[in-house]
Amino acid sequence: MVSMQISLSLVGLLDGSNGGSAVDATVKNLAQLRDEGFRRVWMAQLPYDPDLLTILACAFHEVDTIQVGSGVLPIQVQHPTQLAQRALTLNAIAGGRFSLGIGMSHRMVTEQMWGISYEKPLRRMREYLDGLLPLLAGQAADAVGETVTTRGALQIPGAPTPDVYIAALGPQMLRLAGRRTAGTLTWMTGPKTLAEHVGPTLREAAAEAGRPETAVRVAASLPVAVTDDIAAARARAAEEFAIYGQLPSYRAMLDREGYAGPEDAAIIGDENTVSERLDELAAAGVDEFAAVTFDPSPEGRARTRALLLTRDK
């Protein structure tokens, strides 16, 4: 059996739907998942939620051991210097347990909500890394770009450098991730696409840059429900994740896989069925699988987490 780390991707903690504060909910959930045996979780920064890194600063101070990654932070709304400053400060609090996932968000968000052009995404990400990566490594940045310029250095002694992941799906962004970062974070991407497109593109770029294949990782995320009511779970997945079938970047991944919608990408079934689907992902070259549990009942989510823990390698 090919080894694959199992993590969780948490959604809904920051939006107030839990009925309490986002900080309290995050601390409670991270402590529970740590005690259950999970080593890492990923948390998204949605455009209308409270600030993820601020909440994680509180949570890391209260909860030990467990690792947390941002999955992902959009780069357009903060300068590389500001993000490096925040990420290093957070990782100092976390004692090196933080991973920084960044991405381009989506045109409908950047242009309609923020009034920021989505043009030249590859150039924007490359120039952003030109400033961000030296600063995270404790070096001075001197990067003059068309979309962003970063100069200067930070003084945050003792802060560990966080791993940086890109939410890379297209070939050029995957190549950039392979050359310069710890890897890619994928969503709504199935095993065939991961095996034939994502993994090879990422690792070939790493090799061309003189990096070992082990320097980059594929961290894939999909909805998961261990259940005996497959029809109900598929209907819920189709409704809850409908927006992702409409966003161009994820729609392209669903089309590559031959999926009609997010309900086809979701991993649904009893313990044996879900375990077989996880085997497919591991065989496809996935290094880490971050599950989004979406069963509406606490019992159903607990059943799913129990199965996931048996698969963590």
Model-identified regions with their sequence ranges:
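Active-site-adjacent structural elements that line small-molecule/cofactor binding pockets in enzymes
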Residues: 1-313
